[in-house]
A protein has these predicted regions:
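N-terminal nucleophile
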Residues: 1-238
Length: 238
């Protein structure tokens, strides 16, 4: 929920997320398909609230959550619904981009959402106002959570990402997962963190969208397990 990258080459897309949480929080379940309303959604479920930070819908829509909007905020602990459940409401809707515009987010904690389905959108909710930023899906992007990283650290992580892309001739899911699974010699602010405060990178989750199909990979770093789950739907529309 704290680092997300979006990489595209032609009609191939790789979306990858690192989930950083306090060690008191339970690990997520492995990715499974669930029917939400009329659609199938594939996601790793957070057992605490039942939501998720990363979801893929049967038509190929992907939504990924980061905690916080533009700056670190003080949580008041009195919110109407978890952000992970909000994500599921959005991705399971018939038109996620439209639903997001109309959705009432009153008493929802600030968050950033990366939403992709043919179009790419960066959405931020700061607790008071919605911010929509359309992005070019033919370009590469990276996000870091404002709740965990200062601006200078976010800029440095972006530089690491840009260097990785410049040095990588042939992009593959393995190379991207390896990049996201590297602390880059920094346990405080690398892509894999292990802070004295108890904050730790729990997992790395990735969706690959290409002409050969759609696969979600989930690396459970806490329990040293990995899962590869192909989506069974034949309705994918890239």
């Amino acid at each position: 929920m704290c680092t997300v990258s979006f990489i595209s080459q032609g009609e191939n897309y790789w979306i990858t997320s690192n989930r950083d949480e306090h060690i008191s929080r339970p690990s997520a379940h492995k990715p499974n398909e669930e029917r939400i309303g009329k659609v199938k959604v594939l996601f790793p479920k957070d057992p605490k609230a039942g939501g998720t930070w990363f979801a893929l819908k049967e038509d190929g829509a992907v939504a990924v959550l980061l905690n916080g909007a533009f700056v670190n905020h003080a949580s008041n602990g009195k919110y109407a619904k978890s952000r992970g459940l909000v994500l599921l409401d959005i991705i399971a809707s018939e038109e996620p981009f439209v639903f997001l515009q109309e959705m009432d987010l009153y008493r929802i904690e600030p968050f950033t959402l990366v939403l992709f389905h043919k179009k790419l959108l960066e959405f931020r909710w700061d607790g008071h106002q919605k911010y929509f930023k359309p992005l070019n899906p033919q370009e590469n992007h990276i996000w870091s959570s404002a709740t965990l990283y200062h601006d200078d650290v976010i800029a440095h992580r972006k530089q690491l990402f840009e260097k990785f892309m410049a040095d990588t001739n042939a992009v593959s899911f393995e190379k991207i997962l390896d990049f996201h699974s590297n602390n880059h010699n920094d346990f405080e602010n690398g892509f894999i963190i292990d802070r004295e405060t108890g904050l730790k990178t729990f997992s790395v989750t990735q969706v690959v969208l290409d002409s050969d199909g759609t696969t979600m990979r989930h690396l459970d770093l806490r329990n040293d397990r990995s899962f590869q789950v192909p989506f069974t739907s034949n309705q994918l529309t890239l």
